[in-house]
Swiss-Prot record:
PROSITE patterns: CLAUDIN (PS01346). Residues 1-6, 102-122, 196-261 are cytoplasmic. This is Claudin-18. GO terms for cellular component: bicellular tight junction; cell-cell junction; plasma membrane. GO terms for biological process: bicellular tight junction assembly; cell adhesion; cellular response to estrogen stimulus; digestive tract development; epithelial cell proliferation; epithelial fluid transport; lung alveolus development; negative regulation of bone resorption. The gene is CLDN18. Gene3D superfamilies: 1.20.140.150. Belongs to the claudin family. Involved in alveolar fluid homeostasis via regulation of alveolar epithelial tight junction composition and therefore ion transport and solute permeability, potentially via downstream regulation of the actin cytoskeleton organization and beta-2-adrenergic signaling. Required for lung alveolarization and maintenance of the paracellular alveolar epithelial barrier. Acts to maintain epithelial progenitor cell proliferation and organ size, via regulation of YAP1 localization away from the nucleus and thereby restriction of YAP1 target gene transcription.
Length: 261
């Protein structure tokens, strides 16, 4: 899968995951009344994160919001917080991912900046997906625990008679929507992180070669090549031409016709 395709697929999956998280958080059917062995069928009860509802057999539904915060169970408040954090992180990740798409050019933004933004949005999507999955799983675990506790105390035998003492609740549709939405957001974040590797520019590594100066200097002399030490001092020789004195700074004598024989 190419980098652009991987990035776009991850972006679209994250959008679907965000939409699913919002829908699941707003749904009222997080827990529904268990109708198995329930003698009362005229009333159907279900509860969500924000309110509880009662549906009559006639089709009339009445919902009542939770008017208290401190009076709610701590687990329910934790589920609320996890879902809200997941939604907020997904929204921020989408805003970052829009500018990080390779098919969109924003001024002089280079591939290195897009790679960093893609990685940032991918990490946000992964955390958001984990928050959504964790929130739904915590609520589901709370339902399972209450279900079996209710089952243990639901029937009391007295003289061979069975009496229902409390209502049991089971999984609602919102739990499955939340699990799917969290999974889509998580997969989208992973794909964004994978696309980051293709956007990052490749670094060319050059091997450093150290230069070592030679221990001896080779000086040219008219009579041929002769290795001389670098610490030798140059002497000044005086030559007399046509009766005049002339000083020469180089430490060689002019070649004669016998030097090349």
């Amino acid at each position: 899968m190419s980098t652009t395709r991987c990035q776009v697929v991850g972006f679209l999956l994250s959008i679907l995951g965000l939409a699913g998280c919002i829908v699941a958080t707003e749904m009222d059917m997080w827990s529904t009344q268990d109708l198995y062995d329930n003698p009362v069928t005229a009333v159907f009860q279900y509860e969500g994160l924000w309110r509880s509802c009662v549906q009559q057999s006639s089709g009339f539904t009445e919902c009542r919001p939770y008017l208290t915060i401190l009076g709610l169970p701590a687990m329910l408040q934790a589920v609320r917080a996890l879902m809200i954090v997941g939604i907020v992180l997904s929204v921020i990740g989408l805003l970052v991912a829009i500018f990080a798409l390779k098919c969109i050019r924003m001024g002089n933004m280079d591939d290195s900046a897009k790679a960093k933004m893609t990685l940032t949005s991918g990490i946000m999507f992964i955390i958001a997906g984990l928050c959504a999955i964790a929130g739904v799983s915590v609520f589901a675990n709370m339902l399972v625990t209450n279900f079996w506790m209710s089952t243990a105390s639901m029937f009391t035998s007295m003289g061979g008679m069975v009496q229902t003492v409390q209502t049991r609740y089971t999984f609602g549709a919102a739990l499955f929507v939340g699990w799917v939405a969290g999974g889509l957001t998580l997969i989208g974040g992973v794909l964004m992180c994978i696309a980051c590797r293709g956007l990052a520019p490749e670094e060319t590594n050059y091997k450093a070669v150290s230069y070592h100066a030679s221990g001896h200097n080779v000086a040219y002399r008219p009579g041929g090549f002769k290795a001389s030490s670098g610490f030798e001092s140059n002497t000044r020789n005086k030559k007399i031409y046509d009766g005049g004195a002339r000083t020469e700074d180089e430490g060689q004598s002019p070649p004669s016709k016998y030097d090349y024989v």
